[in-house]
Design a protein with these regions (language model features):
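Alpha-helical transmembrane segments and immediately membrane-proximal extracytoplasmic
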Residues: 1-431
Length: 431
């Protein structure tokens, strides 16, 4: 009996050492990622906050001085020159996404390039967003931090996602959505949970840093939210289906304009000048500056006041496609918010549901349609609009995700699992 007990003791001690070693490894790994996440959140938070402040300044200046809009061709020429000179291989957000699945790096020069070029685009009134630029900015900085700390390839991929989340959170003030977005957008159908802790921590720190820097988080007050019934639920399904259709049209418009530019305007300098002239003519014809920049003013009117002109969504879609595919920089995410909010708002005239809730749900639904990120879309709706209309947002996002098919803003986004059955398909989005 004593011999048996004596034999068990070394085995128990061995098992104890085994578990202690694993706990030590896990704790070391956790501490490593906490430190890296804090550093990423602070560094990306600072750069992104500075980016947001400068962006706000140039936007306000352009709003007060309409003549700046006529400098759009000049801004475009500067942007083309910068990318021809320093960043010919820069692939924008697509390059950041492909980096996470490959051995490639995000060039550090992407950070100053996207910073300056987005500022120039917004200064002159191009129809572009800012989150796309922030994602590239954060991904570039995150990758560079990973290189400085001599991290291996897999860890650098996590650092890219960490930087993306931090930048998105700092610029838009939605840490929950930002933390999930970078893990969800790369491969639809799977989540990179290895990045959960660093993305969450970096996102929160960057958001708080930005708030201390004077960057107020975006939020909108949704009014007149009706009780969810079978009737109102079915009406929201119609809104979601319509927004999914518009999301497909938006993606097709971006691709179509890109092909037209490539066919008829091969020289990038001529292309951006010609596109600027077209944008200026359309804007003067419409006699409004509402479609310049990201479109926050139209979102606010649609969501909080239930006001949108019948063709607001159309002109924002057209001008964004003309701007972004000409070579201007910024991103399509906030314009997609604007298109969804204004289109959802006018759906009220067809279905008789509150224009405010239609605008809010339409914004989330269209964002989901173009990014294929339903969890992020739900979270961003909660953070921007609160939880009172949660049921409507859930309906809108889920229906839009299913109906929008395999279209998307990013050609390097991979659809790993089918949207319609538990089936591995591993295909790229239709772009």
């Amino acid at each position: 009996m004593n011999n048996t007990q004596d034999k068990k003791k070394p085995e128990e001690i061995h098992n104890l050492h085994y578990y202690i070693d694993h706990i030590r490894y896990d704790m070391t790994n956790l501490i490593k990622w906490l430190v890296l996440a804090v550093l990423t959140g602070l560094s990306v938070g600072f750069i992104s906050s500075l980016f947001a402040r400068v962006l706000k300044f140039v936007t306000n200046y352009r709003t007060e001085h309409f003549w700046v809009f006529f400098l759009l061709p000049v801004s475009g020429l500067i942007i083309v020159f910068l990318y021809q000179k320093f960043g010919q291989e820069d692939g924008g957000t697509n390059q950041v996404l492909s980096t996470i699945r490959s051995q490639d790096d995000v060039p550090f020069r992407s950070a100053p390039l996207i910073f300056v070029s987005t500022i120039l685009t917004h200064f002159a009134g191009g129809s572009a967003g800012r989150e796309g630029a922030a994602i590239q900015l954060g991904g570039s900085i995150g990758n560079q931090l990973g290189s400085w700390f001599h991290l291996d390839e897999e860890d650098r991929h996590v650092m890219v996602m960490c930087g993306m989340s931090a930048a998105f959170s700092a610029v838009f003030g939605t840490p929950m959505a930002a933390a999930v977005f970078s893990m969800e957008v790369v491969s639809v159908g799977i989540m990179y949970y290895a990045a959960l802790v660093p993305c969450v921590i970096a996102s929160i720190i960057a958001s708080k840093f930005a708030a201390g820097f004077g960057i107020n988080p975006e939020s909108f007050h949704v009014v007149n939210i009706p009780e969810l019934t079978i009737e109102t639920g079915l009406k929201m399904v119609l809104v979601a289906i319509a927004c999914a259709a518009i999301s497909i049209i938006f993606c097709m418009a971006l691709q179509g304009v890109s092909k037209l530019y490539a066919k008829f305007l091969k020289n990038p300098y001529i292309r951006i000048v010609a596109a600027s002239a077209i944008i200026i003519v359309i804007t003067l014809f419409l006699r409004t500056s509402d479609y310049m920049g990201a479109g926050n003013n139209l979102i606010e009117l649609a969501v909080e006041n239930g006001q949108a002109r019948p063709l607001d969504f159309f002109w924002k879609l057209v001008l964004t496609a003309l701007t972004m595919r000409a070579g201007f920089r910024g991103g399509e995410i906030v314009p997609s918010f604007c298109i969804g909010a204004t289109f959802g708002c006018i759906m009220e005239h067809l279905i008789g549901l509150s224009p405010s809730i239609c605008a809010a749900a339409g914004m989330a639904a269209l964002f989901c349609g173009v990014t294929n990120c339903p969890i992020t879309s739900i979270l961003i709706a909660f953070e921007l609009f609160g939880f009172r209309g949660a049921s409507y947002y859930l309906i809108a996002v889920s229906i839009s995700y299913a109906v929008s098919g395999y279209y998307g803003l990013y050609k390097d986004q991979t659809i790993v699992y089918s949207k319609y059955k538990a089936k591995y398909i591993n295909r790229h989005t239709r772009f």
